[in-house]
Amino acid sequence: MAIIDRLSSSQGLRTQDANKALASEILISQNFEAIDELKNLLTNPPDQKVLFDVLKTLEIIGEANPKMIGHLFEEFIPILSHKKNMVVWIAMSALSHITVFHPQRTFELLGTILQIMDEGSVITRDKGFVMLVGLYTEAAYRPDVKALIVEQLLKAPDNQFGQYVEKWMKVISAEDVPALIDTLEQRLPDLTSPSHQKRAHKNLKKLMRA
């Protein structure tokens, strides 16, 4: 059966079950021929439903085994300008799994990524932040990306702030810990939810002990 026939929309399904099953099968069998078929559908989708299914399947594969879709970085980029936000955030999610393989290209695309983060949904912003943190791990880009991460933390919605802080904490260099402490201290007075305040204080204590 052709890959396109395995997709959820081709089977008349509204759930992601078929896409998940296909992704799982490709992962287990390490089927790069199937990846090539998905690539062709990604660049020349017959309709938007197929595009969505292909993106979702590749995103699932990328989350489990980024190397399997690492070579598709450039194919995802044109999709970032798609008119449907759901399509954009799945493309961003897929890209966030493979940023590590393409740091220079990701750095070149920061303007686009930041614009999408500002204009898109919460999920889009989340995936963009993951990309920033991934790029931060590359020493050559760290100073520039550090400033962008701080900027994102200062304007992050309260309910996203804690998880963003913790994502950066996982990879932060010792020399940048003071910058994160300062950012936490700046945001703390503005956090109105007790749970958000508690989380911020907890992270602040961890950083101060580091």
Can you say where each PLM-predicted feature lies in the sequence?
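Alpha-solenoid helical repeat architecture
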Residues: 7-12, 42-46, 79-83, 117-120, ...
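Amphipathic alpha-helical scaffolding segments comprising HEAT/armadillo-like alpha-solenoid repeats
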Residues: 1-7, 29-42, 66-79, 103-116, ...
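Alpha-helix N-cap/helix-start positions at coil->helix boundaries
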Residues: 12-17, 32, 47-49, 85-86, ...
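Extended alpha-helical scaffolding segments
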Residues: 135-137, 141-142, 146-195
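Non-membrane alpha-helical segments in proteins
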Residues: 21-22, 49-62, 74, 90-97
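Conserved hydrophobic register position within alpha-solenoid helical repeats
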Residues: 18-22, 54, 91, 128, ...
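Structural signature of alpha-helical solenoid repeat scaffolds
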Residues: 59, 96, 133-134, 166-171, ...
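Eukaryotic acidic, Ser/Thr-rich intrinsically disordered low-complexity regions
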Residues: 2-15, 20, 174-210
